[in-house]
């Protein structure tokens, strides 16, 4: 016989044994219209409560006492501010976890029988649901619980106090404990199983694994739970607090940062008239999260259609927010759009309106042309022409070609999004008004996904391109050249991303060169009369009533790939994969002489900076191809002769006004200094016999070293003023409103174009540091590494020369001037040290390499063993001076020390600026 004891609110309490029988369902709770009790199934007896079992969300957030009134249904604190009492927050469990009897069936777990669902503890991001061709890159990953992905729709007036299903949501330190064979049942009829490659396979009918959800409702509940989630996401918050969480800091540390890989999942619910959505990432800090919720609270939902025939590239790369609603006017099963209708219609990325819940492709493209293109044109064509290429509505294109076109465009968009999103600068302070995360929550979530799954996104996108390659090659005669141009541009973008990130392996560079060679891109530079028969070319196509010379465009792509190969060879000291001598290719194929139609950039200021950076890459290519290490059997007398002919790279007027010109001059002077220091070792006895020769050599070396220190100081100062973090900074160079309005092509003009339209003369066409503020340069990392190595090697020379002059006691007028010059160089060394500390992303890498440099390159006696010196040890032995006076003995040691510095500089030039030396 069950006894009912009235509680504080006058409602009967069920027998505990009866409650145990009814609580077998995981989400089942007592539903009574007037019940506001907090039952505990484990208690044997029940006594009346004198106060509310817990504070409401509003009082708990304000940390005040909750005085709940059962008659009004509102506590005193909420009544004063005019808000409603809500008890949506799920409190943390106390005590050990209790065992559950069994897993409840999906039929009983529905929103009709159980309106109290769970508060999500995790977040989710989309990933590829197909096969992983490179599973090793996504090895470190885990998945959140599928049953905790959706925000419930709870009416606060119906129930003020709910029984929290503690046993269903267990506190775990890591989500990686889920086994690969564990099956997860969901409340919406879907069944998920994690396979060996950590992919989520969809088995339910109503599950649509297409994209990411932007929360638009229950914002108060989201913000009230931020403080509780802060303790669970502390490691991720510490990463978000630093602006250097992106994968462009270190190639090795990035592999360990792939903590999880998950898939955004949406499904059709049973709640009428409510839109359910996923939570924001736990890594968002509380104040930032509240701002994002307020930004997205008033936006209407937009139903985006999905294509059932979309291939794995849709799931791999670009995904759009998909909402689920139980409104009968929007059925859950939509008809699939045919390929012909999809190809004939203009794609979503090129729409004429801007959607709030999906990033505009024009915005991504605009960020590239404003922050990347001005320094290195990965897409070697101006924006208006390239946008026209992306339009699939072209004449004489069959349906199969449209399908290939759409797939290639999807791969290109994925590569461009990875480049842009991973280089967006995340703000420490919440006062920033133009930060990427404050503009759109969906954009921020997508960027966080790309950062956490950097290598996997790159590998999947490149694997998709390799899969398309046989079809592209087999149908090369009927596929338009513009589609091939987008295909090879995507390959260049992927290699650009890895080199920009400082990747120390040729993961994609070798296969990319193979793809270009397979399509015979190198034959475009040969004087063939009939070029239309080549695989890359069909015939010139009309684009916007103008003719594009695709032969020039493909030549540009091959030259860009050659420069990327050069940068890897320059940094790592490895042989080049492309050894063609293009001559003056930059002036021939990239300048405005090629015609206004296929010009790289219409703005004169941006075009001038592009040409300067590409000429720097051309010079570094010439610098790498003339390495002595590639000529091991060269006669010893040729080692010290001036073989390098820099006549083609003469210093132009105003060259030192930009970073590229300064770095090119630094490399030239470094080559001259190496030759002078190595000549000292050969003429040691002759120099010591004549004091005048000794003074002349010291003077030349001192002046050359001081000028190099000044150049390094200027380079680092320009980099610091331009973009010390080498990331996209929307505060320093904000995008115009034209990228959001998208009304006309004139409005899409870049800021540099609008600036140059007001210039009165050609003298102002030079690109200044102000024009480059906030832009990203691929040359920045090699520059900083090379400057660090040079300063580390030649830094002791000014101090040594000053001590030598003072010890000799010759304080003539010329000597005093030399000492003043050397003292100025010492002051600049102090400033250079401070500048290196400012360049935080590069400073860590530089210090690590310097440690390897000095530890692994020293012998057991602690002396430096030069690799190049050991190669030429029998060819360039130093002469021994006879009858050397005691006063000249110190000079001899100094000269020998300078010769060792020359060998070290030669090792740096020959073996790479970030290589590891071995004994």
Swiss-Prot record:
Ranges for region Disordered: 1-54, 297-338
Any Pfam family hit: Zn_clus
Biased composition annotated in UniProt, kind: Polar residues: 23-36, 318-338
Residues within the DNA-binding region(s): 56-85
Cellular localisation: Nucleus
Top-level taxon of origin: Eukaryota
PANTHER family (alphabetical): GLUCOSE TRANSPORT TRANSCRIPTION REGULATOR RGT1-RELATED, GLUCOSE TRANSPORT TRANSCRIPTION REGULATOR RGT1-RELATED-RELATED
Protein name: Transcriptional regulatory protein EDS1
Gene: EDS1
């Amino acid at each position: 016989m069950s006894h009912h004891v009235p509680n504080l609110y006058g409602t009967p309490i069920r027998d505990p044994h009866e409650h145990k029988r009814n609580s077998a369902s995981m989400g089942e709770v007592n539903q009574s219209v007037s019940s506001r009790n907090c039952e505990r199934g484990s208690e044997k007896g029940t006594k009346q409560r004198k106060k509310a079992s817990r504070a409401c969300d509003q009082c708990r957030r304000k940390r005040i006492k909750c005085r709940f009134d059962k008659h009004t249904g509102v506590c005193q604190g909420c009544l004063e501010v005019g808000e409603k009492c809500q008890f949506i927050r799920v409190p943390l469990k106390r005590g050990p976890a209790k065992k559950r009897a069994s897993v409840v069936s999906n039929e009983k777990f529905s929103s009709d029988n159980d309106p109290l669902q769970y508060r999500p503890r995790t977040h989710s991001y989309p990933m590829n649901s197909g096969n992983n061709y490179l599973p090793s890159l996504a090895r470190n990953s885990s998945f959140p619980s599928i049953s905790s992905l959706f925000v419930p729709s709870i009416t606060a007036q119906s129930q003020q106090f709910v029984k929290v299903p503690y046993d269903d949501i267990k506190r775990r330190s890591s989500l990686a404990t889920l086994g690969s064979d564990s099956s997860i049942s969901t409340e919406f009829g879907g069944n998920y199983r994690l396979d060996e490659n950590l992919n989520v396979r969809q088995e339910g009918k109503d599950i649509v694994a297409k994209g990411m959800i932007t929360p638009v409702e229950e914002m108060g509940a989201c913000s009230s739970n931020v403080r509780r989630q802060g303790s669970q996401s502390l490691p991720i918050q510490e990463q978000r607090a630093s602006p250097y969480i992106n994968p462009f800091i270190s190639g090795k540390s990035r592999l360990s940062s792939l903590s999880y890989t998950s898939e955004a999942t949406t499904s059709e619910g049973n709640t009428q008239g409510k839109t359910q959505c996923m939570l924001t990432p736990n890594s968002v800090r509380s104040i930032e999260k509240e701002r994002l919720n307020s930004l997205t609270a008033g936006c209407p939902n937009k139903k985006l259609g999905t294509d059932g025939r979309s291939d794995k590239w849709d799931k791999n790369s670009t995904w759009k927010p998909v909402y689920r609603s139980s409104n009968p006017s929007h059925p859950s099963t939509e008809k699939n759009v045919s390929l012909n209708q999809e190809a004939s219609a203009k794609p979503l990325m090129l729409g004429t309106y801007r959607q709030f819940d999906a990033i505009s492709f024009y915005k991504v493209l605009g960020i590239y042309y404003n922050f990347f293109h001005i320094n290195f044109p990965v897409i070697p064509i101006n924006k208006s022409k390239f946008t026209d290429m992306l339009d699939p509505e072209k004449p004489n294109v069959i349906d199969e070609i449209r399908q290939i076109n759409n797939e290639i465009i999807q791969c290109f968009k994925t590569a461009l999004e990875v480049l842009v999103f991973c280089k967006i600068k995340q703000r420490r302070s919440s006062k920033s008004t133009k930060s990427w995360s404050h503009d759109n929550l969906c954009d921020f979530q997508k960027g966080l996904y790309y950062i956490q799954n950097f290598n996997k996104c790159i590998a999947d996108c490149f694997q998709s391109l390799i899969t398309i390659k046989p079809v592209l090659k087999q149908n090369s005669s009927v596929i338009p050249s513009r589609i091939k141009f987008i295909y090879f541009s995507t390959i260049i973008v992927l290699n650009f991303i890895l080199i920009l990130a400082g990747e120390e392996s040729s993961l994609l560079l070798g296969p990319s060169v193979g793809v270009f060679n397979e399509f015979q891109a190198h034959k475009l530079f040969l004087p063939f009369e009939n070029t239309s028969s080549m695989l890359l070319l069909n015939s010139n196509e009309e684009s916007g009533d103008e003719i594009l010379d695709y032969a020039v465009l493909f030549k540009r792509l091959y030259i860009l790939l050659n420069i990327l190969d050069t940068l890897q060879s320059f940094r790592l000291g490895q042989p080049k994969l492309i050894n063609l001598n293009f001559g003056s290719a930059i002036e021939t194929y990239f300048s405005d002489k090629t015609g206004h139609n296929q010009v790289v950039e219409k703005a004169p200021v941006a075009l001038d900076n592009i040409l300067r950076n590409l000429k720097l890459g051309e010079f570094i290519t010439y610098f790498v191809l003339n390495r002595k290490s590639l000529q091991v059997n060269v006669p010893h007398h040729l080692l010290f002769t001036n073989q390098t002919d820099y006549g083609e790279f003469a210093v132009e007027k105003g060259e030192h006004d930009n970073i590229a010109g300064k770095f090119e001059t630094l490399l030239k002077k470094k080559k001259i200094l190496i030759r002078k220091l190595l000549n000292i070792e050969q003429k040691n006895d002759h120099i010591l016999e004549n004091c005048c020769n000794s003074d002349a050599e010291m003077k030349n070396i001192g002046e050359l070293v001081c000028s190099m220190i000044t150049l390094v100081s200027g380079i680092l100062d320009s980099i610091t003023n331009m973009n010390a973090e080498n990331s996209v900074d929307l505060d320093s160079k904000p995008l115009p409103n034209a990228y959001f309005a998208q009304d006309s092509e004139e409005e899409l003009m870049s800021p540099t174009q609008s600036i140059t339209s007001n210039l009165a003369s050609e003298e102002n066409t030079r690109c200044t540091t102000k024009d480059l503020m906030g832009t990203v340069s691929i040359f920045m990392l090699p520059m900083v590494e090379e400057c660090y190595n040079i300063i580390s090697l030649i830094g002791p020379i000014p101090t040594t020369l000053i001590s030598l002059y003072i010890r000799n006691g010759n304080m003539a007028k010329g000597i005093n001037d030399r000492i003043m010059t050397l003292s100025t160089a010492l002051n600049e060394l102090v400033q250079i040290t401070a500048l290196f500390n400012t360049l935080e992303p590069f400073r860590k890498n530089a210090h690590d390499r310097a440690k390897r440099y000095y530890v692994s390159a020293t012998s057991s006696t602690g002396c430096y063993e030069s690799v190049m010196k050991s190669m030429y040890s029998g060819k360039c032995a130093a002469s021994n001076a006879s009858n050397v006076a005691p006063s000249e003995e110190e000079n001899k040691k100094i000269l020998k020390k300078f010769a060792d510095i020359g060998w070290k500089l030669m090792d740096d030039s020959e073996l790479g600026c970030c290589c590891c030396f071995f004994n």
